[in-house]
């Protein structure tokens, strides 16, 4: 009985398996005509079953095209799959007609689908973003120099281009870079660390920690090239505070979102190279939400990735 804004109503659900929509014979969305212009729209809907609509918006002159809503199938069945691989395998086998997936597909899966007879693939940038959050209520996330050091050593461009094969683009803020009139130039630590190689990023991150009052028994070193850094030992924050052990970076698993899953592994490793005991933990999306957004848990986590 839930209200819907479409020509269908919820029909039945089998938990963990499927749910169905049934066509609503009294819908207002059947038979109406919509005309699209360059800078305007005209809507003329009067099917005798719902209040008539006849409205125009914007500039309704010049070239246009029209389409009529409907007819609709009687029932739509949504089969529920646990991950992308299972869903797209069903698609390739003809078991489902389309896949609803707001997260995009992995590059190898995209290439695989492009080779399926009768399937045409189109690639465009997703309208979304992924982010990593520090818990600024607790140490070490509460320390600005720590956050800046992690931002510096994290070579996002390397992961995006070399590991994820360019399926996403780097963002240094929440405003899409295409909106050039609104995006301020990158400054500060992000600008200072842009374009640095792995050795330079490590050394710069250590400098940031030292300038922020961090100390270490041995600050470690980086041999250059693709080698991992020899991590600092005995590292302590300002005032001699020892970072916690067994800190977790929560991120959705690879079956749900391979982009965040992959990035979390690299960022956790970079934090380890700075002497922090951090592990990437694949976790269900809703589990992460419950863990980090409830007041009673507000100090029980250190890092997470969502979007």
List PLM regions with ranges:
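A structural "hinge/loop" feature
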Residues: 1, 5, 131-133, 143
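Append "and occasionally in soluble cytosolic enzymes with long acidic Gly/Pro-rich linkers
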Residues: 9-12, 16-67, 142-273
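Extracellular/periplasmic catalytic domains that process cell-envelope and extracellular macromolecules
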Residues: 12-15, 67-72, 114-115, 125-127, ...
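Short amphipathic alpha-helical segments
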Residues: 72-76, 130-132, 245-247
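Alpha-helical scaffolding within the catalytic cores
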Residues: 117, 230, 289-293
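Periplasmic binding protein-like
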Residues: 248, 272-307
